[in-house]
């Protein structure tokens, strides 16, 4: 039954939906410890996907409840929403997750109104939190002061973070971690009487790993500190290594990784702590890395509009080979690409618009194993015409007129994805040294193998569809043909029936829609013969259908790959054993 409601009551209903979302988010997150202790790896993957989908499900549920309980004349009167927003601000002022509550309000507003109603008066285009936030710190870290006795501090850490599953070999791990810290850090650090170790109280869980995250610091310097932990089934918990290199820690929090499960009483405080460890990371990426991807989206959007307002940067087409399905543009001074679906695809492409959207959602929900770039989806972006180079705007209007629309002096982009900008692998190799070429091609092969072991087949594996990150990692970013590895039928090319068969431009054998012939990869993937020969030496087993069939068999048996976001010696083949 619809009824009349004051603004404060509507605000309370919106906040009640947020509380429901946060409670279920915490419930899923809190289960990560038990899943790690019980080695429930497939359940961990399901929980990750469930938590990603939870936000949109709860937004839809809240919007439906508002529509059912309130008259349209009250709910859909946009003139009332500045009053509702003010009432909402008063209700979230004392919360410890208030910035997330603002983003939730925005999501509800966008679920009720078209995007042309968006303004800072009706929703939180700009946050109100920094000037209002109470500065009481939550006790979310533990501090250890070795006083020259690092071993004793490590023993205390092992005790404080113990699990219900015993350590595999506590003494061995203590000795190894102690030795690694002494070798990784300058000689004087471990002896410094003022050295302190500060660790976040909550454990970070992701896939088959757990991580203790913090820092080592003296009065003058600091180093990030990460202890990766593994559960070796049948043996126990193992401190796998210790990481103090900022670049390596940055990779652990990379945009190519799945989101961490970590208890976060005060999100802004945790993100601020991580930002001190990783100053090169944007707030958007840090919020996203701990599961608050919608907050990451808000922070990204605010950074984007600030960049456009404070620079002369203009959108240009992204460098690289033009895509057959997507058109990609970028801002030179903003480390992001914007991807839109073309109205018409190249005839060789069998996908449609709906399929492309499904592929991007698959990537969002799946374990990205450090080899798939995360994306954010946006609707109804509006930019001034003056922010586009004429050639860029003309191309976008030509290839995607249903998505890119002129509205006077404003360009409306109805739908797009944003993604971290990388150097296309084919362009990277054009200027690479011999050593860089070998390293990049080796990582390209590892990327394909790690994706395959995680049940992902890229489909179109051309070099142009992979990018190189600032840390030199090779990442796949073209998703229109991506699929589960177990959906593919890997075959050997049949022997020719007659000598003439080999000379024919058409195959002498039938080819199904999911058939893939790995023997054809060398010719399709590499025009450069030197690169082709080098890749065959590095990863020649990718050309053998039996290799792929073996991976499929192990995936169907329920094996979950170990892919470590830090340096290890194992190959992808060994990790499945």
Swiss-Prot record:
The keyword ATP-binding applies. ATP binds at residues 318-324, 339. It is found in: Cytoplasm. Keywords: ATP-binding, Cytoplasm, Glyoxylate bypass, Hydrolase, Kinase, Nucleotide-binding, Protein phosphatase, Serine/threonine-protein kinase, Transferase, Tricarboxylic acid cycle. It catalyses: L-seryl-[isocitrate dehydrogenase] + ATP = O-phospho-L-seryl-[isocitrate dehydrogenase] + ADP + H(+). One of its GO terms (biological process) is glucose metabolic process. Its EC number is 2.7.11.5, 3.1.3.-. Pfam families: AceK_kinase, AceK_regulatory. Its main location: cytoplasm. The active site is at residue 374. It comes from the Bacteria. GO terms for molecular function: [isocitrate dehydrogenase (NADP+)] kinase activity; AMP binding; ATP binding; phosphoprotein phosphatase activity; protein serine/threonine kinase activity. InterPro entries: AceK_kinase, AceK_regulatory, Isocitrate_DH_AceK. One of its GO terms (cellular component) is cytoplasm. Belongs to the AceK family. Bifunctional enzyme which can phosphorylate or dephosphorylate isocitrate dehydrogenase (IDH) on a specific serine residue. This is a regulatory mechanism which enables bacteria to bypass the Krebs cycle via the glyoxylate shunt in response to the source of carbon. When bacteria are grown on glucose, IDH is fully active and unphosphorylated, but when grown on acetate or ethanol, the activity of IDH declines drastically concomitant with its phosphorylation. This is Isocitrate dehydrogenase kinase/phosphatase. It comes from Pseudomonas aeruginosa (strain LESB58). The lineage of its organism: Bacteria, Pseudomonadati, Pseudomonadota, Gammaproteobacteria, Pseudomonadales.
């Amino acid at each position: 039954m619809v009824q009349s409601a004051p603004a404060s009551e509507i605000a309370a209903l919106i906040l009640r939906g947020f509380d429901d979302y946060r409670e279920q988010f915490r419930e899923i997150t809190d289960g990560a410890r038990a899943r790690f202790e019980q080695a429930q790896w497939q359940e961990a993957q399901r929980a990750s996907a469930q938590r990603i989908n939870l936000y949109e499900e709860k937004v839809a549920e809240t919007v439906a409840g508002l529509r059912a309980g309130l008259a349209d004349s009250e709910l859909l009167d946009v003139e009332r929403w500045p009053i509702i927003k003010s009432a909402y601000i008063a209700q979230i002022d004392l919360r410890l997750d208030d910035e997330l509550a603002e983003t939730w309000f925005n999501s509800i507003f966008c679920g009720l109104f078209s995007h042309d109603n968006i303004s800072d008066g009706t929703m939180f285009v700009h946050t109100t939190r920094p000037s209002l936030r109470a500065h009481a710190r939550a006790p979310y870290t533990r501090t250890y002061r070795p006083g020259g006795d690092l071993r004793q501090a490590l023993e205390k850490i092992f005790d404080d973070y113990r699990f219900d599953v015993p350590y595999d070999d506590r003494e061995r791990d203590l000795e190894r971690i102690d030795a690694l810290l002494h070798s990784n850090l300058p000689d004087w650090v471990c002896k410094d009487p003022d050295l302190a170790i500060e660790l976040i109280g909550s454990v970070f869980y992701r896939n088959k790993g757990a991580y203790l995250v913090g820092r080592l610091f003296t009065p003058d310097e600091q180093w990030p500190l990460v202890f990766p932990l593994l559960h070796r089934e049948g043996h126990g918990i193992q401190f796998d290594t210790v990481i103090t290199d900022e670049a390596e820690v940055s990779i652990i929090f990379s945009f190519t990784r799945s989101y961490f499960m970590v208890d976060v009483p005060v999100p802004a405080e945790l993100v601020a702590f991580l930002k001190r460890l990783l100053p090169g990371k944007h707030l958007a990426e840090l919020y996203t890395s701990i599961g608050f991807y919608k907050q990451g989206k808000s922070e990204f959007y605010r950074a984007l509009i600030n960049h456009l307002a404070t620079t002369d940067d203009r959108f240009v087409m992204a460098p690289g080979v033009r895509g057959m399905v997507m058109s990609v543009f970028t801002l030179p001074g903003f480390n992001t690409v914007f991807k839109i679906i073309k109205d018409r695809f190249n005839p060789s492409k069998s996908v449609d618009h709906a399929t492309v959207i499904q592929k991007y959602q698959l990537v969002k929900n799946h374990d990205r194993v450090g080899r798939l770039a995360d994306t954010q989806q946006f609707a109804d972006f509006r930019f001034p015409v003056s922010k586009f180079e004429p050639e860029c705007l003309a191309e976008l209007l030509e290839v995607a007129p249903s998505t890119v629309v002129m509205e006077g002096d404003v360009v409306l982009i109805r739908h797009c994805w944003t993604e971290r900008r990388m150097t296309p692998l084919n362009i990277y190799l054009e200027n690479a040294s011999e050593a860089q070429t070998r390293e990049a091609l080796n990582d390209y092969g590892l990327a394909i193998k790690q994706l395959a072991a995680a049940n992902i087949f890229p489909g179109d594996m051309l070099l142009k569809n992979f990018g190189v990150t600032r840390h030199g990692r090779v990442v796949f970013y073209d998703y229109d043909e991506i699929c589960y590895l177990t959906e593919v039928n890997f075959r050997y090319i049949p022997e020719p029936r007659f000598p003439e068969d080999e000379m024919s431009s058409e195959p002498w054998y039938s080819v199904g829609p999911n058939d893939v012939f790995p023997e054809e990869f060398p010719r399709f993937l590499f025009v450069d013969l030197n690169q082709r020969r080098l890749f065959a030496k590095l990863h020649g087993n990718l050309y053998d259908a039996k290799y792929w069939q073996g991976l499929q068999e192990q995936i169907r048996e329920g094996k979950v790959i170990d892919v470590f976001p830090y340096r290890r010696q194992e190959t992808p083949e060994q990790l499945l054993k």
